[in-house]
């Protein structure tokens, strides 16, 4: 009976994520401060992951605004942070002394903001298929999280790239600065 209940929960999760992916509304764009989005997502996970170091490093100390949908972008960073935490937890199973670390580095030029997210988890197994719907390397994964993230970033006129890193994973996001 427990197996059936777990499968029902998994199917509900898959249906909900598929619905989100298929019917994702267009973003409602307005001037937002990117720091607010990042701080909100980081704060959410800091509370429940006290043994994890979560840092935001800004090269430019002034406020940075983008034309974005705060709810959509919050979803992006919550999803990416969740994936990083899961990757760190998986690596901790092999190395219990590992001190988990996630760093968000923010830099700008005249036109774009660049957000680099680095973690010291297990890293990506396959970056070529990572944003294809239903591709997953997780036992409980639906393969829709990163395609949704990619779609949201693209809908904001941005770009997202995933890299294998010798020490974990690296994600680079660029978004146009509000003008």
Regions found by a protein language model. Give the residues of each.
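A conserved beta-strand-to-alpha-helix junction within the catalytic ATP-binding
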Residues: 28-42
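ATP-lid-like helix-loop hinge signature
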Residues: 86-108
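Conserved micro-motifs of the catalytic ATP-binding
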Residues: 24-27, 65-68, 137
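Conserved catalytic submotifs in the C-terminal HATPase_c
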Residues: 53-64
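Short conserved segment of the HATPase_c
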Residues: 124-134
């Amino acid at each position: 009976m427990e197996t059936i209940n777990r499968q029902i929960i998994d199917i509900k999760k898959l249906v909900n994520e598929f619905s989100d992916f298929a019917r994702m509304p267009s973003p409602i764009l307005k001037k937002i401060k990117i720091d607010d989005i990042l701080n909100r997502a980081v704060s959410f996970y800091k509370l429940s992951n006290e043994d994890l170091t979560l840092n935001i490093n800004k090269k430019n100390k002034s406020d940075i605004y983008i034309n974005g949908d705060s709810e959509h972008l919050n979803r992006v960073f919550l999803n990416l942070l969740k994936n990083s935490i899961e990757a760190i937890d998986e690596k901790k199973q092999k190395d219990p002394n590992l001190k988990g670390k996630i760093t968000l580095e923010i830099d700008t030029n005249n036109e774009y903001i660049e957000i680099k997210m680095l973690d010291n988890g297990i890293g990506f197994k396959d970056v070529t298929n990572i944003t294809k719907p239903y591709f997953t390397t997780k036992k409980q994964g639906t393969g829709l999280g990163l395609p949704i993230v990619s779609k949201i970033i693209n809908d904001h006129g941005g770009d997202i790239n995933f890299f294998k890193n010798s020490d974990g994973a690296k994600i680079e996001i660029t978004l146009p600065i509000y003008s």
